[in-house]
Amino acid sequence: VQDVNVKKQFIEEEQLLEEAFKLAVTIFDSGFRPDFIVGIWRGGSTVGIYVQECLQYLGVNTDHISIRTSYRGQPSYGELVDNPERIRVHGLQYLFENLNRGDKLLIVDDVFSSGYNVEAVITRLKAKCRRNMPEEVRVGVPYYKPDKNLSGRKPDYFLHTTEDWLVLPYELQGLTPEEIVQHKPDVADILSTIQQGA
């Protein structure tokens, strides 16, 4: 459950695209050349597509895949903080079959907050890949919330630190109709046609 006193920062689609390309250049400039890129669904998939595309343009060919995390019966993100072991990771079979010890793995998400999603992915990969688990695993995100981090892991690459409630371009849940009208007017127009037709 989000604190109503936390400031909402609305991220525009064009802004997220630019941040993803900047993240890719930051990764490239560091000298890291991933063999695999894993985007964590939902927002990490979007960022991962742009990171992969930019790295490929810069001559870094990668294998790339999107995976998903979920919470075992937990309807609320807030409950996750007290029960991180309840995170499930879906869609890893391709990685189990293709990762090797010498590979370099980049995990991408849109926001690194508690760190539990990334930690769950790495823990699950280590358990199943065992000796084939890549020795070099790095994490990249446009947005990092250090005060919310409970995992003991910090992203290797991030562009911004914030404690704001980030509202990403695709998000509608948790927004009031007034916020949608103000910050997502095109979406508000589309939604109003549905409501009128209902």
Describe each PLM feature range.
Residues 1-198:
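PRPP-associated nucleotide enzymes
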